[in-house]
Amino acid sequence: MKILVDENMPYARELFSRLGEVKTVPGRPIPVEELNHADALMVRSVTKVNESLLSGTPIKFVGTATAGTDHVDEAWLKQEGIGFSAAPGCNAIAVVEYVFSALLMLAERDGFSLRDRTVGIVGVGNVGSRLQTRLEALGIRTLLCDPPRAARGDEGDFRTMDEVVEEADVLTFHTPLYKDGPYKTLHLVDETLIRRLKPGAILINACRGPVVDNAALLARLTAGQPISVVLDVWEGEPDLNVALLDAVDIGTSHIAGYTLEGKARGTTQVFEAYSAFIGREQHVALETLLPAPEFGRITLHGPLDQPTLKRLAHLVYDVRRDDAPLRKVAGIPGEFDKLRKNYLERREWSSLYVMCDDASAAALLQKLGFNAVHHPAR
């Protein structure tokens, strides 16, 4: 049995070699000749999986180590009897912490308290719901917009997009990409919506590039109307609009979900799915794969305020470390993908062990995902 895996999937060789012969390949483009001699294909979001890629090959199973699946033609796979699995929620925590890193940076730069801002979350799935929980733990007001969930009657106080645009100071998008249908998200953030953003608003897109009309956004930014923009995803990736990158506050190379933990979850989820598919079901404990974190222990004295949270969050991950490299190479062919391929190891807040002499600080940090304990001062 031969299994092709994307070369940027951590722990893939270690895990999938338990099931057969493993060959690592680049995700963009996949070497077609390798597909003719493989039984299974494990990819990331950079690989378009469809009839043109797989027709006539012996591939019997496709796994994507990603939460999103818009790069996979699931209907065609089903029609051909090819097994499929994604990794829903694998990088949700990573994306949430990316958003927090950006917001804490902007709050420090512009001198505002996050508790004084209302955050509109558009798309309340694995990422959006976790973001809501952490924001509300800090006492930050959230507005939720998720038309499909609202239509299903799911529990939650869902607002319309009009209400969110009208009331929110921050708009952060965490939707799938739907190019048509009743819940189309292609250019969900269009020229009309962009015009309606209040002065000083913050716009964050960490889901799919085409959710935001990049040309319309650039037009507003170059018109001198003050809004702050954080973009991790772009129309036309791996090519991007360099003028738009120059105009945004934070721009990164589609790496919001790129924590070591998130990548490892994605790999283990598709590994477990494939092992079940071939009748050799196995389960993997994530902690057995991950290395020790860079920082062993932090001691925190007193209550948790926003500047302290910012220091702790940025000790683990400061979004600016990914903004600067993209600006240096933007517009150079191949460099966008190279940044992703050679991405520096990044951990999640749970990797940071924080000893707190204040019980309320420990409790709040735990709600935010840190590995915090209360250790009274003596």
Swiss-Prot record:
CDD domains: ErythrP_dh (cd12158). It comes from the Bacteria. InterPro entries: D-isomer_2_OHA_DH_cat_dom, D-isomer_DH_CS, D-isomer_DH_CS1, D-isomer_DH_NAD-bd, Erythronate-4-P_DHase, Erythronate-4-P_DHase_dimer, NAD(P)-bd_dom_sf, PdxB_dimer_sf. Its main location: cytoplasm. It is found in: Cytoplasm. One of its GO terms (biological process) is 'de novo' pyridoxal 5'-phosphate biosynthetic process. Belongs to the D-isomer specific 2-hydroxyacid dehydrogenase family. PdxB subfamily. This is Erythronate-4-phosphate dehydrogenase. It catalyses: 4-phospho-D-erythronate + NAD(+) = (R)-3-hydroxy-2-oxo-4-phosphooxybutanoate + NADH + H(+). It is an enzyme of class 1 (oxidoreductase). Homodimer. SUPFAM superfamilies: Formate/glycerate dehydrogenase catalytic domain-like (SSF52283), NAD(P)-binding Rossmann-fold domains (SSF51735). Pathway: Cofactor biosynthesis; pyridoxine 5'-phosphate biosynthesis; pyridoxine 5'-phosphate from D-erythrose 4-phosphate: step 2/5. The gene is pdxB. Catalyzes the oxidation of erythronate-4-phosphate to 3-hydroxy-2-oxo-4-phosphonooxybutanoate. Transmembrane segments: none annotated. Keywords: Cytoplasm, NAD, Oxidoreductase, Pyridoxine biosynthesis. NAD(+) binds at residues 146, 175, 232, 257.
